[in-house]
């Protein structure tokens, strides 16, 4: 099995790669079929996920079974002033990965954020699949666009995960 992890230099990408390579996580063992996976960590400048041609070429060349997208523009305040950069990383990037995954048959695991929710439901506590998104920041809005693109372009093999605060 071959797994590409985008955003490998970030906090989440670094931890996912570590756990895949060690074969264990804080919540339990890694599934056996992932134990001996070839893990391909990738980040800027090697792969700019906002560049469709670069993504398409890279994914076709690598032929992964799984793509775990941890890449994002995560500076919440920065997203308010750098709309273009936020849109490229958080919306176009996931779209490009979704299209490439769909073309090659790879499974896409797209990591999003609880910022796609307003925090006003349930007293701002638990969000679940039934919670209606309602971002209140540019960061949340661009991450929600990325989720929508993944849903639109990756029909066969996708999984979306929301993270909260990372420690």
Predicted regions and their residues:
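Conserved small/polar residues in nucleotide/adenosyl-binding loops
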Residues: 161-167
């Amino acid at each position: 099995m071959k797994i590409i992890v985008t955003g490998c230099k970030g906090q989440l990408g670094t931890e996912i790669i570590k756990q895949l390579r060690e074969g264990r996580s804080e919540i339990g063992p890694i599934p056996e079929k992932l134990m001996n996976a070839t893990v391909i960590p990738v980040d800027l400048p090697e792969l700019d996920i906002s560049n469709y041609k670069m993504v398409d070429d890279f994914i076709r060349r690598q032929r992964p079974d799984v793509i775990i997208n941890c890449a994002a523009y995560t500076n919440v305040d920065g997203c308010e002033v750098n709309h273009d950069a936020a849109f490229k990383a958080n919306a176009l990037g996931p779209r490009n990965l979704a299209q490439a995954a769909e073309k090659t048959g790879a499974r896409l695991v797209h990591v999003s954020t609880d910022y796609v929710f307003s925090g006003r439901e349930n007293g701002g506590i638990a969000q679940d699949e039934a919670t209606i998104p309602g971002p209140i920041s540019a960061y949340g809005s661009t991450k929600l666009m990325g989720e929508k693109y993944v849903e639109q372009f990756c029909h066969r093999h996708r999984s979306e995960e929301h993270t909260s605060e990372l420690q």
